């Protein structure tokens, strides 16, 4: 900043929610104030930092945020086309319905006090399902989630949460970079099955 006058002025920088700012004076949150010298050339440099964090959701579940981005565990799935006639309206491809079924494990819990590793990836499209721009690697514990009573393909609203195996290293990706996903997971203590 080049400043000619004799007056000092204050530059206010609002630090976005879910981030902090790092400069030569340390790390801060909220509002960042810079006081300029009376005149002359003035430079400053700072860096915005976001850290992965778990937020509590209803029903004792948690979601992973990184800055303003919500992350989810991607689930492999298969689509089955449903063509039918209802109330005289024919639903044929491409105007039919689809059911999506999981082809990979989805019953997991966050492991208390596990680290999160943010991985920046090369990408061509911001919400690419196969090559998302960011991934967060962490340990998840396989659990017995259970099904809604009377439904074979509807996950229980409140998981049982009982550990069913050893912790596994998994990568979560931005919510918008997934089709079939688990976004809210319970928390489980570190340990072995």
Question: What label would you give each PLM region?
Answer:
Residues 13, 27-29, 73-75:
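Short amphipathic beta-strand/extended segments with alternating polar/hydrophobic composition
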Residues 18-37, 52-59:
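Solvent-exposed beta-strand/loop surfaces of large extracellular or lumenal domains
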Residues 9-11, 38-48:
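Short, well-structured beta-strand segments within conserved domains
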């Amino acid at each position: 900043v080049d400043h000619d006058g004799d007056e000092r002025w204050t530059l206010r920088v609002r630090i976005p929610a879910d981030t902090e700012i790092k400069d030569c004076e340390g790390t801060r949150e909220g509002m960042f104030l810079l006081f300029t010298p009376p005149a002359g050339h003035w430079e400053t440099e700072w860096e915005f930092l976001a850290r992965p964090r778990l937020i509590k959701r209803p029903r004792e579940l948690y979601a992973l945020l990184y800055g303003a981005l919500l992350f989810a565990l991607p689930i492999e799935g298969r689509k089955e086309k449903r063509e039918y006639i209802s109330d005289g309206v024919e639903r044929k491809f491409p105007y039919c319905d689809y059911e999506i079924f999981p082809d990979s494990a989805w019953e997991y819990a966050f492991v208390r006090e596990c680290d999160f590793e943010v991985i920046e990836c090369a990408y061509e499209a911001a919400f690419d399902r196969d090559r998302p721009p960011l991934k967060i690697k962490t340990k998840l514990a396989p659990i017995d989630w259970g099904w809604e009573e009377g439904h074979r393909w509807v996950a229980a609203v409140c998981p049982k949460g009982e550990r069913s195996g050893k912790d596994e290293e998994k990568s979560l990706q931005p919510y918008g970079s997934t089709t079939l996903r688990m976004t809210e997971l319970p928390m489980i203590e570190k340990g072995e099955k």
